[in-house]
Amino acid sequence: MVTDTISDMLTRIRNANMIKHQIVQIPATKMSKAITNILKEEGFIEDYEIYMENSYQFLLISLKYKGKSREPVICKMVRVSKPGLRVYSKSKKLPKVLDNLGIAIISTSKGVMTNLKAKELGIGGEVLCYIW
């Protein structure tokens, strides 16, 4: 059993990107659905769909590549807040990822969102990961 579903999700996507898989399968949780939705909105993945198998829900994520050499759109994914060490940030001190070329995914009281949207709304929260 996986204790940190977010790290597991990021690792599965990172591994699939390295070997240039088109689709990756991830166990569906509320958090993984929210993060996947943000990745789609921000253009890091093509699409995703939810499917059932033996009463378990899974996410099928279609990864996005650019050019003929199929370079992954996602260059790096870094887990920030971990179960052993939570990292929180106030609205005025939300991190910038590569001068806003990347995103930070923040878990706030209003839901999971990017650092830019959280800054817009003036709320802070737990910094889950950086993606660029």
Swiss-Prot record:
Protein's gene: rps8
Protein task: One of the primary rRNA binding proteins, it binds directly to 16S rRNA central domain where it helps coordinate assembly of the platform of the 30S subunit.
Cellular component aspect of the GO annotation: chloroplast; ribonucleoprotein complex; ribosome
GO biological process terms on file: translation
HAMAP family in the cross-refs: Ribosomal_uS8_B
Coarse class of the protein's main subcellular location: plastid
Keyword flag Signal: no
Domain of life: Eukaryota
Descriptive protein name: Small ribosomal subunit protein uS8c
Complex formation: Part of the 30S ribosomal subunit.
Biological source species: Trieres chinensis (Marine centric diatom)
Family to which this protein belongs: Belongs to the universal ribosomal protein uS8 family.
Keywords for this protein: Chloroplast, Plastid, Ribonucleoprotein, Ribosomal protein, RNA-binding, rRNA-binding
InterPro entries reported in the protein's UniProt record: Ribosomal_uS8, Ribosomal_uS8_CS, Ribosomal_uS8_sf
Subcellular location: Plastid, Chloroplast
Molecular function via GO: rRNA binding; structural constituent of ribosome
